[in-house]
């Protein structure tokens, strides 16, 4: 019976830890989309001709402004260094989940960039 209680406690703690990291990953994906919207709004409000962003014009590790410039379905433009990156977490399961969220966010924000 003691083992059952221990198993329940461990499962509860593991679920809580996974939920916290899942929220962090979702927040990171959302912040990438918000960054794209802000950049697009700044370009649209300005009087000068907005910069033309080419879809898939930057490889992983190159400088970028918007997510759609980075090549790869789950590649995003990192918020702080503004470089294309794909890895979300060191944990393979969380990384896979985060890349899925990135891919969904990229699918939504693709209209910012022109196709080549």
From Swiss-Prot:
GO molecular function, one term: ion channel regulator activity
Keywords: Disulfide bond, Ion channel impairing toxin, Knottin, Secreted, Signal, Toxin
GO CC annotation: extracellular region
Signal peptide range in chain numbering: 1-19
Record has Iron-sulfur as a keyword: no
Compartments where located: Secreted
Domain of life assignment: Eukaryota
Disulfides per UniProt: 56-71, 64-77, 68-113, 70-84
Tissue: Expressed by the venom gland.
The protein's role, per its UniProt record: Ion channel inhibitor.
Family: Belongs to the neurotoxin 25 family. ICK-8 subfamily.
Domain notes: The presence of a 'disulfide through disulfide knot' structurally defines this protein as a knottin.
Protein's name in the database: Toxin ICK-10
Organism: Trittame loki
Source taxonomy: Eukaryota, Metazoa, Ecdysozoa, Arthropoda, Chelicerata
């Amino acid at each position: 019976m003691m083992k059952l209680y221990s198993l329940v406690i461990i499962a509860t703690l593991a679920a809580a830890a996974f939920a916290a990291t899942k929220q962090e990953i979702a927040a990171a994906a959302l912040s990438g989309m918000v960054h794209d919207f802000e950049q697009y709004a700044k370009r649209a409000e300005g009087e000068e001709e907005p910069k033309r962003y080419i879809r898939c014009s930057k490889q992983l590790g190159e400088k970028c402004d918007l997510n759609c410039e980075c090549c790869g379905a789950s590649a995003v433009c990192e918020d702080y260094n503004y470089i294309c990156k794909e890895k979300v977490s060191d944990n393979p399961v969380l990384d896979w989940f985060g890349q899925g969220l990135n891919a969904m966010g990229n699918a939504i924000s693709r209209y910012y960039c022109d196709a080549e």
